[in-house]
Amino acid sequence: VKLATDRLITQLHLRVESAKAGHDMKYEQFDFESKVLHHQEHIQRYLDGQHPIPLNIEIDLTNACNHRCSFCVWATYIGEVRATLPLGIVISTLDELKALGTKSINWTGGGEPVLYKGFYEALDYSYQLGLENGLITNFSLIREEHDDQILEQLLWARVSMAGGLREQYREIQGVDDFDKVIANLKRISEKRRVQQSKLTLGIAMLVKPGNLHSVPDMVELASDIGLDYLQLREDMFISPPEKAWWKKQVIPVFNRAEKRAEEIGLKLLGAKYIDTQEYLNLPSKCHAHHFVLGINAEGYVAFCKNTRDNPDFYIGDLRKETFSNIWEESLKKREMESSINPISCATFCKNMGINKAIEDVVQCNITLPLVDPEPPVHVNFL
C-alpha cells in the first residue's frame, strides 16, 4: 500500500516539477492515467458509490467509411452492420449527457464521422451546449466551407495517416487520398495560425511493417505542415511476434525520429498503454466505464468503449430508452460491473491506465483531494 501511495503522489509531483522545468511530457494528452487523477471530485463520487456518469463519451455517428484501412479494428463490424445513428437521437442524447455531467465528446468511429450528413449540425449543437469536442478522422472529406466551424468548435482533431509516403498510405488505407489529406491539413493549419485558433491538430500513425520505413518522411511532413504533434503508436491488439519485432526494429527507428523531431521542433508523442500482465492483475474490477464510454452507430451503449462492436457488452439501446434510464436501470450494466475482470482484457487496452490510477486510490484508501498541479492538456478526454 505504501508503495502504491508513494507512486501516486510521486506521479503528481513529477508532473508539477516537469511543468516548472518546461519539459515536454512524452505522452501528454495520451497519458490517461495522469489525466483521470485530475478529476478528483468525480473519483470521490465514484468511490462513494454514486455511479457518476462518464466524463467523456465516444460517439460513432456512422459505420460508413470512405477508407479501407488494413489495421482497422472495426472493419468486420462496420462491413457487416451498415448503421447510422439518427440525428434526433444524437441531439437528445447530447442534451442528457450535458445535464448529467458529461464534459466532452469524441466524434469517432466506427466509420468516418465526417461522412455523417448531420455531422456539422451535431458538432454545433454539442458546442453550443458547452461540451468540449474532439474529432478522430481521416481528414479527406474536410471542405473549406466548414473550416471556420472546425477551427472554432473543435478542441482537437487527430488525423489517422498510415504513412509518410503516398504509396505506403495508399497500400494501408486502401485509397489514394494522400494529396487531398495533405492539402486539407495545410489549409487548416494556415487558417489556424492566422485566426489564432485553439484547435490542436496532429497526426496519429499506427506503425506496421508495411509503413515503418516511412516514419522519417512522416516526421518531416508533420513539421512542414506546422502540426502540433505526431503520434507514433502500436496496435493495441499487437501479437507476441509483433512485440518482438517492435522492440528490435521499431524502437531504433523511433529513437532516430525523436532526435530529428527535437532538431526541427516537432512534438513526437507515443501511446501510453499498460503493456504487462502484472498490471492487468492489479484492478479488483474495471472502473473505466464511469469515466469514458462508447455509443455505436446502431444506438447501443457499450459497457466498454473497446467492445462497442460486441453485443455481449451492450447495456442498452438508445433507440428504445434514454441514456439516463440505461445508466441508472440497466441490469446488464450491474451484472457486468460485478463480473468483468480486467485480467481477461488485452494488455494494450487504453482503459487500463484509468483502472491503474483508480486502483491506486482504492487500495491506498487515500483521502481526496490529492496534490492538484496544472491539469494536463485536454484533461476531459479520457
Task: Enumerate the predicted regions with their spans.
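Radical SAM enzyme core and accessory elements
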Residues: 1-51, 298-300, 312-313, 318-325, ...
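C-terminal accessory region of radical SAM enzymes
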Residues: 13, 19, 190-198, 247-280, ...
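Conserved alpha-helical substructure of the radical SAM core
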Residues: 13-156, 171, 183, 243-257, ...
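Short cysteine clusters
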Residues: 65, 69-72, 286, 304, ...
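Secreted/processed peptides and extracellular or luminal domains of membrane proteins
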Residues: 71, 75-78, 292, 310, ...
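Conserved C-terminal portion of the radical SAM core fold
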Residues: 100-108, 127-136, 155-161, 179-274, ...
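Short, small/polar residue-rich loop motifs at catalytic or cofactor-binding pockets
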Residues: 286-289, 312
